[in-house]
């Protein structure tokens, strides 16, 4: 079972992501702030990370940069920030995708599945 870390401070959004992912056979962990999320991402084994940008403790851009220094797993940014500059910055720091809130939960699951399939092909 693929394991996904959700780093999201909005409990409602985190639970929505969790519910849809678990209904599709994924195992999930939730971190509600940047520092906890970064520690989990670096200290535990995950197959993919869903990462918000605006987080208490440490922002998602910093977390993305830090994860990319040591891990090669898909990172999908899920953020209310919809300006091109934010998308370009996130992708430039190593995110594999950038999804703007509000989002379709079914589209989120489809993107997660697509990124996991591509990473699996690249690493096998």
Protein language model annotation of sequence segments:
Residues 1-123:
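N-terminal/domain-start alpha-helical segments
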């Amino acid at each position: 079972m693929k394991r996904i870390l959700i780093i999201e401070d909005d409990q409602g959004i985190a639970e929505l992501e969790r519910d849809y992912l678990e209904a599709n056979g994924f195992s999930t962990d939730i971190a509600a702030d940047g520092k906890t999320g970064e520690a989990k991402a670096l200290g535990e084994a995950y197959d993919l990370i869903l990462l918000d940008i605006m987080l208490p403790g440490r922002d998602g851009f910093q977390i993305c940069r830090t994860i990319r220094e040591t891990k090669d797993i898909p990172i999908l940014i899920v953020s209310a920030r919809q300006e091109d500059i934010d998308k370009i910055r996130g992708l430039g720091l190593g995110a594999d995708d950038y999804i703007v809130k509000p989002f379709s939960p079914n589209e989120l699951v489809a993107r997660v599945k697509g990124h996991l399939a591509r990473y699996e092909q690249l690493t096998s």
